[in-house]
Amino acid sequence: MAASNQSEVNIGMVGHVDHGKTSLTRKLTGVWTDTHSEELKRGISIRLGYADCEIKKCETCDEPECYTVDKKCDACGGKVSTLRKISFVDAPGHETLMATMLSGASLMDGAILVIAASEECPQPQTKEHLMALDALGVEHILIVQNKIDLVSEEAAIENYNQIKEFTKGTVAENAPIIPVSAHHGANLDVLLKAIQEFIPTPERDETLTPKLYVARSFDVNKPGSEIKDLKGGVIGGSIIQGALKVGDDLEIRPGIKVTEGNKTHWVPIVTKIISLGVGGKKLKSAAPGGLIGVGTELDPNLTKSDALSGSLAGLPGTLPETLEKMVIKPQLLERVVGSQDELIIEPLKTNEVLMLNVGTSTTVGVTVSARADKAEIKLKLPVCADKGDRVAISRKIGSRWRLIGYGIIL
């Protein structure tokens, strides 16, 4: 079980740009996840945003009115008890940021697909995000039909029917569809009830060797800080198995690129965990669930501006090898989703350049050999990954990377 300050489950907020993912996250958590200056300017999410909330229940009111994220019951003002703490991963919906969404999907135990009732369904990234969840094995999905305050009842029903048609034959075929107005906070109690019912907390085994997917990394020092006041680099991400505690040594792979003569290789970084935190609260140990900040002894230059995002961290000597070549068993989709004309997907070809997402890392590779059941890919940036891990595969079509399927590392 995660420490009491920790979230138990990570839920992705996915969907087409501007359909209300960030607004819905804010309504549930009180946190506006677009805090990056460029995001505020452009009004879209660029990096992964994180925010936590507690689902609470009033003991006296009937369902669904009894569910809330507030300190008191919304219906009667009475006492509430906490059922579960959850973390939202707010993924960008813009097509040029698909790689960021794919790296976020590896952290998700379940997902909420946000679809605006005010637009035709499906929009390109609605399709692409659903395919990504399918490809990366995210099975517990809820659909939020947002912006119902902007349409008539007839239009909302027509949009609902479009959603049903669109999800047929996908991982979300039987997903509940919940009409919501994030702007007015309407029907959030119904959504909270559905999260409790349809997105379970995964069973975690804390005795396994710990592994942490690094999604962000920071230099938390302010410019002009005194040397004695400088803090070590901070990494942020999700523990996917096992548990880490303050004082543990930590190995981070692939690590640092070292060039000697005309040869380049990667050296893992080893450091010590100085602090663990979640949502501003300190922890002595951390288990799977939620998004954890890990304070280290690293030079902040190594962690600034997400320099270590995409890494895998764990106890020294326990991580898988760093791969500069990858052999995968590909499973390709039938058609390209997310583009206007849905082209048939051709098999992988030798010397083709592909974008690959494994864990939270994004890399580009060239296929050295390609058969229907096996492809070998030489990576531009190495990754640290295990046999059996899923890899999302994207191909450049026109000027954009498009998801074409996934592979299993052999």
Curated annotation (Swiss-Prot):
GO CC entries: cytosol
Gene Ontology annotations of biological process type: formation of translation preinitiation complex
Record key words, sorted: GTP-binding, Hydrolase, Initiation factor, Magnesium, Metal-binding, Nucleotide-binding, Protein biosynthesis, Zinc
Keyword GTP-binding: yes
Region G4, residue ranges: 146-149
Ranges for region G2: 43-47
EC numbers on record: 3.6.5.3
Chain intervals for the UniProt region annotation (G1): 15-22
Chain residues that bind Mg(2+) 1: T22, S45
Binding-site positions, Mg(2+) 2: D18, G43
Cofactor(s) named in the record: Mg(2+)
Record domain tr-type G: where: 6-203
Subunit structure: Heterotrimer composed of an alpha, a beta and a gamma chain.
Chain's role: eIF-2 functions in the early steps of protein synthesis by forming a ternary complex with GTP and initiator tRNA.
Official protein name in the record: Translation initiation factor 2 subunit gamma
Organism field: Methanococcus maripaludis (strain C7 / ATCC BAA-1331)
